[in-house]
Amino acid sequence: MSTSSSSSDNGAGGSGGVFEAPSPSRPRRGANDVWPEPFLESLAVQVAVNASTSAGLLAAAPALANVFRVCTTWHAVSRSDHLWQLLSRQVWARTHLMHDTWRDEFIYRHRTARNFRTRTHTYFTLQFDPSDVDEPDSLSCRCLTLSDLYLAAGFADGTVRLFLLNNRLHVRTLRPPLRDRFGRFSRAVSGIVISDSRLTFATMDGDIHVAEIDGVGHTRTAYAGDIVNDGALVDFTGCGRWWVGLFAGVPGRAFHIWDCNSEETTFVGGTLTDPEAVMGWHTLTELTTSLGRLRISGNETAVACTRWRIMVIDLRNQGVIIGEDEEQRRGLIVTGFDANDEAYVRLDSRGNASVRRVNTQQTVCEFRVSGAAQRRVMGCVNRLHALMCAGGIMRVWEVERGEYLYSIRERVGEVDAIVADDRHVAVASASSTAQSIIHLWDFGAL
């Protein structure tokens, strides 16, 4: 384990600072004392939201401190846990309490974001027992997924290894039921979805498997893929209600949507991957460049990227296209694409990156990724930052204005998979032994 920090004062130290809501130096009485608490809570939330919108999410806390300084009545509202619950949801999009109080939750999210901006983190490599595999591809990681509690890694033989984030231990290995293969990589994991109590993963042959995270029961197949009629499942993701798959191999069947409660298919269609139909079949038998990426943005919107086009679809309305973004001249680097709840990052073949709104495709900011034209690039995004890895070096930009922040000190080699949320970054990279090395950076408030 190593700890890295580029600043001795990252705005997260101690228990004081902007969160203490200091009492005003000259308390004022009168009209301020009769303002009802719900009004003051609404005002504080609005001030925080306005500050985060105009100056960035880290501006919310100082703006709140100014509100709490107005008078003793306004200072008193800072003790309302209901207020901090509203603030955690509106500013940090947190609806699940991970700490003792919502005030603690808000403080933690602010300090973690500050750590991310100032390169303050701890670094680990995750360990697992490789002796239970018998194929050379079995230790090659193909995808990574993060939740609040777990990191899941999907491998080329269909295995998913689950790690607990608080102690970084490998706690469970999941394998799909045995089935005939349609090629060397037909059982490779395409994507993983982690919910509160279960883990769902899909393989390139189109199968979807479900297992309880607590270890009760075996992995079961929720959906049996039809590889002949659908092609290869090149990416898979999901949210609270939906599973979504991106297929390549058969024209007109790019998107598949399932209701994850009933496990029934609700939509099949789309032409996004039609130009990649032939290459879709090659992905089952040989290592190829990534043909497509698929992400959930918000609760019920999916964003997909191929070399030539980005498409936004509405899951509630079963695949209705609500936005398109084409790059017919230079082409896009698929592995440089990712999305958060509001925006996506696209990267063209010359290294020009842009952050665009999911709903409107409006450009938020732009930045340049050096070396993208000559080297393989793997990227991801969280709420505030875009990370791009090329040549073993991972660089970080903020996504509100496109400002370059820093490069991660640890070198990772050739990257096979990458994922980030607001606290963690995980990378799987190749090694000389053919076993993927899983790197983990933790920016949690220290």
Curated annotation (Swiss-Prot):
GO terms for molecular function: DNA-binding transcription factor activity. GO terms for cellular component: nucleus. Keywords: Developmental protein, Differentiation, Flowering, Nucleus, Repressor, Transcription, Transcription regulation. Expressed in inflorescence and floral meristems, young floral organ primordia, and later in ovule primordia. Residues 1-10 have a biased composition (Low complexity). GO terms for biological process: cell differentiation; flower development; megasporogenesis; positive regulation of organ growth; protein catabolic process. It is found in: Nucleus. Residues 1-32 are annotated as: Disordered. InterPro entries: F-box-like_dom_sf (IPR036047), WD40/YVTN_repeat-like_dom_sf (IPR015943), WD40_repeat_dom_sf (IPR036322). Its main location: nucleus. Mutations in the SAP gene result in the ectopic expression of AGAMOUS, leading to partial homeotic transformation of the external floral organs. Mutations affect equally ovule development and cause floral sterility. PANTHER family: TRANSCRIPTIONAL REGULATOR STERILE APETALA, WD40 REPEAT PROTEIN 12, 37. Transcriptional regulator involved in the specification of floral identity. Acts as A class cadastral protein by repressing the C class floral homeotic gene AGAMOUS in the external flower organs in association with APETALA2 and other repressors. Is required to maintain floral meristem identity in concert with AGAMOUS. Also interacts with APETALA2 to ensure the normal development of ovule. This is Transcriptional regulator STERILE APETALA. It comes from Arabidopsis thaliana (Mouse-ear cress).
